[in-house]
């Protein structure tokens, strides 16, 4: 959330951010409301001063026997009271409108962010792991076909149980997801992260604090009512990311300098209504309604946030390095930068099966497995999260950052395709074997029930 003062003093900076991020907000209306509100507050201060002066003279006039003048003062006091009430009511209305309007303004991109219209103008910063690729089959089978053949992914039963966009991981597929979650948590514990296991349901106030509401209502799962209905502060939603509950742990709190940097990690299932929109994303587990993810959230001093941002990128990368998966780092341009972010990098892993136009020369495609973001004070201001170095010092807003560490299903996709063998089995990455009871190769399972009879 941008402060009123910043918007008031930097309207052209805000206007440029709206253009660069493609956000349609009536900034002129916000500025007009702010100006009228300030004029009313000034008029209200004048009236309160006059009321106090008039009130102090009434007794003096009565004591002096000037009844007519005293009566005039009483009448003026009542007029001031009535006018002041009208002004305060109007000022409260404008302030409420202003607060809601400020929630619609996006974060200002950091000056280092490349300017661009859309994702085609994102900037690739580097690639890792392509100098020593393992040999993959000439025709890598897509994860969605291989997963069904090995009986470790079940899309039909996922749809039967919950509807389209859901899947079931079973057998070694389920073990692989569990292994990845525990492995990721262990890696980040080594990086001094503190574990959090938050509620899966979050209230509207929490969603607003991190910026999911009011802008992204249509993508969220609401527990009661429809997304089109008005919502109250305590209405519940299924969390779209652990960023929401973990950031809001310290909503309306003041941390101490000695607490910072404060680094949390949380595993949660995540729920989003954005499943499969086009192309190969309509198949498999690349884009689904429910998925597992480990999230890292940092609370830091403002002057340290951009250095910590680079550290957070490295902490997410460490998972990919240990899994020995090829990947690249992409910096988002202004047009592809999220509503809340000042700066963002995506970590994209290589999945070699499905060739896509924007994929690498080796074939296949890129899959985003982590977005690492610096929100600066944007979320902290919305959620009221401050810090002070010493007890006697004034509190100021801190900076928040987060990053996926990582999104589990897409790592499963990368493993099933990159570690695929000619015989249709999948080699388990060495780093994961201790988490899978020493299993080195996923060979699959027999089908159960009449489905294994095929067409018979």
Curated annotation (Swiss-Prot):
Keywords: Aminoacyl-tRNA synthetase, ATP-binding, Cytoplasm, Ligase, Nucleotide-binding, Protein biosynthesis. Pfam families: Seryl_tRNA_N, tRNA-synt_2b. One of its GO terms (biological process) is seryl-tRNA aminoacylation. PROSITE patterns: AA_TRNA_LIGASE_II. SUPFAM superfamilies: Class II aaRS and biotin synthetases, tRNA-binding arm. It is found in: Cytoplasm. ATP binds at residues 272-274, 288, 368-371. CDD domains: SerRS_core. Pathway: Aminoacyl-tRNA biosynthesis; selenocysteinyl-tRNA(Sec) biosynthesis; L-seryl-tRNA(Sec) from L-serine and tRNA(Sec): step 1/1. One of its GO terms (cellular component) is cytoplasm. Its EC number is 6.1.1.11. It is an enzyme of class 6 (ligase). GO terms for molecular function: ATP binding; serine-tRNA ligase activity. The keyword Nucleotide-binding applies. InterPro entries: aa-tRNA-synt_IIb, aa-tRNA-synth_II, aa-tRNA-synth_II/BPL/LPL, Ser-tRNA-ligase_type_1, Ser-tRNA-synth_1_N, SerRS_1_N_sf, SerRS_core, tRNA-bd_arm. It catalyses: tRNA(Ser) + L-serine + ATP = L-seryl-tRNA(Ser) + AMP + diphosphate + H(+); tRNA(Sec) + L-serine + ATP = L-seryl-tRNA(Sec) + AMP + diphosphate + H(+). Belongs to the class-II aminoacyl-tRNA synthetase family. Type-1 seryl-tRNA synthetase subfamily. Homodimer. The tRNA molecule binds across the dimer. NCBIfam families: serS. Consists of two distinct domains, a catalytic core and a N-terminal extension that is involved in tRNA binding. Catalyzes the attachment of serine to tRNA(Ser). Is also able to aminoacylate tRNA(Sec) with serine, to form the misacylated tRNA L-seryl-tRNA(Sec), which will be further converted into selenocysteinyl-tRNA(Sec). This is Serine--tRNA ligase.
């Amino acid at each position: 959330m941008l402060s009123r003062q910043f918007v008031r003093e930097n309207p052209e900076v805000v206007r440029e951010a709206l253009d660069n991020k493609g956000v349609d907000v009536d900034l002129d209306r916000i500025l007009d409301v702010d100006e009228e509100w300030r004029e009313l507050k000034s008029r209200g201060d004048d009236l309160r001063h006059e009321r106090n002066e008039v009130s102090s003279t009434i007794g003096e006039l009565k004591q002096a026997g000037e009844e007519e003048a005293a009566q005039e003062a009483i009448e003026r006091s009542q007029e001031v009271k009535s006018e002041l009430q009208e002004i305060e009511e109007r000022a409260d209305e404008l302030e409420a409108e202003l607060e809601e309007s400020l929630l619609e303004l996006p974060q200002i991109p950091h000056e280092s962010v490349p300017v661009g219209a859309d994702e085609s103008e994102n900037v690739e910063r580097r690639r890792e792991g392509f100098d020593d690729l393992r040999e993959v089959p000439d025709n890598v089978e897509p994860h969605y076909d291989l997963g069904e053949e090995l009986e470790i992914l079940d899309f039909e039963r996922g749809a039967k149980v919950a509807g389209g966009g859901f899947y079931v991981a079973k057998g070694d597929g389920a073990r692989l997801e569990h292994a990845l979650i525990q492995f990721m948590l262990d890696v980040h514990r080594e990086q001094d992260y503190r574990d959090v296991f938050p509620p899966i349901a979050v209230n509207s106030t929490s969603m607003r604090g991190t910026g999911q509401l009011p802008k992204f209502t249509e993508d969220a799962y609401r527990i009661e009512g429809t997304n089109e209905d008005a919502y109250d502060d305590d209405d519940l939603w299924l969390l779209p990311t652990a960023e929401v509950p973990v950031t809001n742990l310290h909503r309306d709190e003041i941390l101490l300098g000695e607490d910072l940097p404060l680094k949390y990690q949380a595993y949660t299932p995540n729920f989003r209504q954005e499943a499969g929109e086009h192309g190969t994303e309509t198949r498999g587990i690349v884009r689904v309604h429910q998925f597992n993810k480990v999230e890292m959230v940092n609370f830091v001093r403002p002057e340290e946030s951009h250095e910590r941002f680079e550290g957070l990128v490295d902490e997410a990368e460490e998972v990919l390095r240990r899994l020995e998966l090829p990947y690249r780092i992409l910096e988002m341009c202004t047009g592809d930068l999220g509503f809340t972010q000042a700066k963002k990098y995506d970590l994209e892993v290589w999945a070699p099966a499905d060739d896509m136009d924007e994929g690498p020369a080796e074939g296949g495609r890129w899959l985003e497995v982590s977005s690492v973001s610096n929100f600066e004070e944007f979320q902290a201001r919305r959620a009221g999260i401050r810090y002070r170095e010493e007890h006697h010092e004034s509190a100021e807003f801190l900076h928040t950052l987060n990053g996926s560490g990582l999104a589990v299903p897409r790592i499963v996709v990368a493993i099933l395709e990159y570690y695929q063998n000619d015989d249709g089995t999948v080699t388990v990455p060495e780093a994961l074997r201790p988490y899978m009871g020493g299993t080195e190769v996923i060979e699959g399972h027999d089908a159960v029930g009449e489905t294994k009879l095929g067409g018979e």
